[in-house]
Amino acid sequence: SLLKLRNTTKWWSKKEVEQHKLDYVLDCIYRSPSKQLKYNFKVLIFDETKKCKQIKDWLYWEHTYCLNKIRGAKGNGLRRYNGQVLAPIVLAWASEKNDLEVIEDIMVSSTTALLAAEDIGLNTGFNGCLESRELGQKIGETHVHMLLGLGYADKIDTEPTRKVFKDGVEMGYDLGNGVQGERINNSIGEYYGR
C-alpha cells in the first residue's frame, strides 16, 4: 500500500522537486474537500530562493526545535530538530483564523497533499511543532498551522537518530529517515459495540 513504505523524511538530498510533480500536488490540494466549501486558508510555497531559505533556516534553528521536550525552550543541552522544514519545497497552510473548523480543513488539505506527493514518488515530512501566530507574523500572515516538506530523502536510515552540527559544533539530533509510528496505535480497527 502507499503508506506502507512511507517514511517521515527529515534529511533531504539536493535533488530538485520537478515542477510537474509540485503542480500535481498543488492541483490535489486545490481539489481537496473543505467543510461547506469554505477553504479559509491559503497554501504558501517555500522553495530554495534566498528569502525562502532564510525562513526555513529560522524555522530549523530558532523556531521548531525542542529542548527538554518543549518547543523553542531556551537553555543549554542538546536539542531535537525538525528537518522537515529544510526540505527543498515546504508548503505552509496559513489562515486568518485559529479555530477548529479551519484547522480541520487544513488537516484534510495537508493530508491530501502528503498522499499526492507520496503517490508520485516524493518523500514527505509533516511539521506542526510551531507557534502559529509567531510564524505567521514572521512571514506576514496571521497564523500558519501546518508545514509539509516535499523532496527526496538522502537515504533511509538504519539508526533512529542523526546528530545535528552547526559550524562544527554538535547542537543536538533529529530523527533519521525511517518509519516512525508504525504499529504504535493499537486502537485502530475496533468495531463499535463488539
Walk through the language-model features, giving the residues of each.
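Acidic, surface-exposed loops and disordered segments
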Residues: 1-194
